């Protein structure tokens, strides 16, 4: 099984941004732990602060990943284009926060 994780704006600052709210662990540390705990799953990870790059990544992996876990950050509330990209691909997309 292949699971792709996509994080949107400001999620590159996890571990640094408001640690009292979001914790002090970087996403890369969490991602490395996830790969160790589930070695039978192929994980890949992408993060961007740019809406178009998130859409390009959805198009790129949206026909090969079994599941996409998407935390689009603030774009969850504002991006019609990301919603359209999700509708255009075959992979299952689960929105996470």
Regions found by a protein language model. Name each.
Residues 1-4:
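Extreme N-terminal starter segment of soluble prokaryotic enzymes
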Residues 13-28:
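Glycine- and acidic-residue-enriched helix-capping/strand-helix junction motifs
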Residues 39-43:
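A generic structural motif
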Residues 44-52:
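Short beta->alpha junction loops
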Residues 53-57, 78:
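Short acidic active-site motifs
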Residues 56-64:
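Short, well-structured alpha-helical segments in soluble
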Residues 66-97:
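Mid-chain, well-packed structural core segment of small domains
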């Amino acid at each position: 099984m292949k699971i792709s994780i996509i994080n949107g704006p400001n999620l590159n600052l996890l571990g640094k941004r408001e640690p009292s709210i979001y914790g002090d662990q970087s996403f890369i540390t969490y991602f490395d732990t996830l790969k160790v705990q589930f070695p039978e799953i192929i994980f890949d990870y992408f993060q961007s602060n740019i809406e178009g790059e998130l859409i390009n990544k959805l198009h790129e992996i949206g026909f090969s990943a079994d599941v996409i876990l998407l935390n689009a950050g603030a774009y969850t509330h504002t991006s019609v284009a990301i919603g359209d990209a999700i509708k255009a691909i075959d992979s299952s997309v689960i929105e996470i926060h």
